[in-house]
Amino acid sequence: FIIKKKIKKARVYISAAGLYELFLNGRRVGKNRLDPTYTRFDRRNLYVTHDITSFLKEKNAIGIILGNGWYNHQSLAVWYFDESPWRARPRFCMDLKVTYEDGTEETLSSDKDWKTNSGGIIFNSIYTGEHYNASLEEEGWNNYDFNDEHWKKSISTTAPSQNIVSQSLHPIKFKEILLPTEMRKFNSKKYIFYLGKNIAGISEIKVRGEEGTVLRVTHSELLDEKGEIDLSN
C-alpha cells in the first residue's frame, strides 16, 4: 500500500486464532512472543495493538506468519487440546489505522485481496517445536518490491467468536540471553549443550554445512543415567 500524506501516528490492531508474527517493510513489529495468548477461542479472541508510526514509508508491505499455537493443537498430551471443539486452521484479522497531520484518518483492513503462501516453517506445535526448511524461505517476501504473482489469494473466513477484545495482560518478551555452561560431545553428529537452569525460551544457533543437511535440535528438562536427554516427563 502507498501513503501520500505526512503521518502523525499509525497503529495496527491484530487478532489471530493461533499465533502470529507481524512484519512491516521487512522488519518485525514488536518484541512480544507467542501472541495472542490462550483463550477459549470459541468464546473470546484477543487483539494486540502495535505502534507502527516509525515503520511506515511512502511504499509499504505487510507480512504475517501464522502458527498453530493453542488453536490448532495437533500434538497428543494429557490435556487433549487436539480434541478442542474450536480447532481449525490458523486465521487472523487486522486493521491498520493511520492518522495524518492534516487530521484525516485512513484504515486498511485485511481482506480477500491479501495473498498467501507456505514458507520455511513446514510444521509447528506448542509442545513439539517446529520443522524449518531453509530452502523454502523466499528472500524479501515481506518487502514492497517482492514479486508475489505465484502466491495464492487468501480465503475470507469468520472469527472463532464474535467477542474480540484487547489483550491486557503483560506480554511475553525476551529477558536475557543464556550461553551454555557445558558442552558434551557424544559423537561427530550428537552434542548436548547444558544451560545450567530450567527455562522457558528458544534456541539460537549458527551453522555452516552442505545444502540439504538436516539439523535436529531437541529440548529436555532431564538427563538419564548416561547423560543423554530424557523426554519421559
What feature does the model see in each segment?
Residues 1-233:
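Extracellular/oxidizing-compartment recognition motifs
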